[in-house]
């Protein structure tokens, strides 16, 4: 029987890929590598800097858009993002639909001094230790992909390794689950991973229900400064931008434009 949703299909492939990697590098080996890695950077401090932060993403493809960009040198792209003023660099490592890899994560980590987010579909504890072993400071956890008890344990394990979890939601119900699990950083994805449909009003509906102590990140749909300002007005602390940057002719300048808008005195400030 074929998977029921787009997310189910992605997760099926991820589980197979994780099993293959674990057959090559055991859980005990990846745990040892994680323990030996340099300590993670302070993601919360980066996200609490004044203004609307920009999380700039290294992303080659997506299930909705297909191939986006040929990124021959992810390290160079990450450096451009950092030079443009990005707070965090996100690296998509899922290989089947997004054409990412852990090699991309390694290259980016070695090239920038700001925090790095591993963006993938985390379904096994192995992937958490793997992220830390490859230098991630932050890790994506998708509520729709995890049962509640698993979400809680994954969040606890992520934080026990010193990383910050970006807990992704798409509905008010998922946001409630994220809060009950103890999420400190919640990302609202305008794209429904079940269908790939986009609801651009999603963030504005969900953000007001989140406590002021929670960092709120808007994901998907940022094509320029107008979108950043709209998300800021709805209460975003930061925006995560991928497609709009990798398809731009000058990613450093594209990030710099967003950063300038997000730190301008006229930019709406999140209520705290």
UniProtKB/Swiss-Prot annotation:
Catalysis: reaction(s): 1-(2-carboxyphenylamino)-1-deoxy-D-ribulose 5-phosphate + H(+) = (1S,2R)-1-C-(indol-3-yl)glycerol 3-phosphate + CO2 + H2O
Organism: Mycobacterium tuberculosis (strain ATCC 25618 / H37Rv)
Additional remarks: Was identified as a high-confidence drug target.
Taxon lineage: Bacteria, Bacillati, Actinomycetota, Actinomycetes, Mycobacteriales
Official protein name in the record: Indole-3-glycerol phosphate synthase
Gene Ontology, cellular component aspect: peptidoglycan-based cell wall; plasma membrane
GO MF term set: indole-3-glycerol-phosphate synthase activity; magnesium ion binding; phosphoribosylanthranilate isomerase activity
Domain of life: Bacteria
Keyword set, alphabetical order: Amino-acid biosynthesis, Aromatic amino acid biosynthesis, Decarboxylase, Lyase, Tryptophan biosynthesis
Pathway membership, UniProt: Amino-acid biosynthesis; L-tryptophan biosynthesis; L-tryptophan from chorismate: step 4/5
Gene Ontology biological process: 5-phosphoribose 1-diphosphate metabolic process; L-tryptophan biosynthetic process
Transmembrane feature ranges: none
Gene: trpC
EC number annotated for this UniProt entry: 4.1.1.48
Pfam families documented for this protein: IGPS
Family the entry assigns: Belongs to the TrpC family.
PROSITE patterns linked to this entry: IGPS
NCBIfam families xrefs: PRK00278.1-1, PRK00278.2-4
